[in-house]
Design a protein with these regions (language model features):
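Catalytic core of non-heme Fe(II) oxygenases with the double-stranded beta-helix
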Residues: 117-197
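Non-heme Fe(II)/2-oxoglutarate
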Residues: 1-128
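Residue-level detector of functional hotspots within protein domains
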Residues: 113-115, 151, 206
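Catalytic core of Fe(II)/2-oxoglutarate
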Residues: 174-239
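Structured loops at beta-to-helix junctions and adjacent beta-edge loops in soluble globular domains
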Residues: 52, 66, 79-82, 132, ...
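Extended aliphatic helical segments
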Residues: 16, 28, 39, 47-48, ...
Length: 239
């Protein structure tokens, strides 16, 4: 897929692209019988937790990264995938929901992050570290999107949500959240200080990262199954 010229990456051109059918429309989640955590519903679809554990930088700088062809400014280091290989593919490509991830060789070099995920005590799916180059708020708003975490997820399972854990200290950068794709009036920006943990229903809230720079930004992104146990863990992490 050809990427848009950087100067055209703004929400005004995005509206035009959408109306002309040049961008695939996002599918807004419908009500399902999946278990959803009350703690997320109480906080409107996202909840900011207290600061997470200290992780040495060697656990994210010495990994194998790849970039999707549509976004050359963003790279990912898979820690858990559908097959255990260092690949950027959805679990559905292998007939699986985004659960029961298998640790990759990258995870062997990130023992603190593995312990962090294991401490939550639940099922996880895709786990990856994002490495982001400086990105303006204009470009971030262009990149607002919904995830597709629950494709193939049986109704007997919990709803899959995502946790962001900020590894570098970028207080002038933010995770941008919106209920509606073009609803700037109700936009939320979560500052990305080192240790910031944000749990998001990423199929309900449009989201993107704005990174002021000048250095690269690193964060861990974890797909998690909603359960009573995870609800309790989240509440234990509230400020």
């Amino acid at each position: 897929m050809k990427t848009a010229d950087p100067l055209l990456k703004n929400e005004y051109s995005k509206r035009v692209y959408a109306r002309l059918g040049l961008r695939r429309p996002f599918t807004v989640q419908q009500e399902t019988r999946h278990y959803r955590m009350p703690v997320l519903q109480e906080h409107g679809g996202h909840v900011v937790l207290r600061s997470g554990p200290e992780i040495p930088s060697t656990e994210w700088t010495n990994l194998e990264y790849s970039t999707p062809p549509t976004d050359p400014t963003t790279w990912f280091a898979p820690l858990a995938t559908a097959t255990g290989e260092n690949i950027l593919q959805g679990f559905w490509d292998f007939g699986k929901p985004d659960l029961d991830g298998i640790w990759t060789s990258n995870a062997d070099r990130a023992p603190g992050l593995v312990r962090y995920v294991d401490s939550m005590g639940g099922r996880f799916g895709r786990i990856q570290i994002i490495r982001q180059e400086p990105t303006s708020i204009r470009e971030a708003r262009w990149g607002l999107h919904l995830d597709d975490n629950n494709r193939l997820n049986p109704m007997a399972n919990g709803w899959v949500v995502r946790l962001w854990f900020q590894l570098t200290d970028d207080p002038d950068s933010s995770l941008v959240l919106r209920r509606g794709q073009f609803d700037r009036a109700n936009e939320v920006r979560v500052p990305l200080r080192r240790g910031t943990q944000v749990l998001v229903d990423s199929e309900a809230l449009f989201h993107s990262g704005c990174h002021k720079g000048p250095d690269r930004r690193y964060a861990l992104i974890v797909s998690l199954e909603s359960t009573d146990h995870l609800d309790g863990w989240v509440r234990s992490q509230l400020p």
